């Protein structure tokens, strides 16, 4: 069963798939891992680590932006 935070991230992924398919497709490939100690979010290209308290403060558009931002790290390999 998904947490409310995971649902928020999944909803943002779906929105990206509909609005920006490239970003949405890449975002769906990242495995979600809760990691409060990182403070925000990060990726290594296979995982998306996130701090639940940070995600909780974001509105839906900000959550979509965060996912697109993390996906760009993957796309640009940095």
Give the residues covered by each predicted segment:
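Basic/hydrophobic alpha-helical interface regions
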Residues: 1-67, 71-78
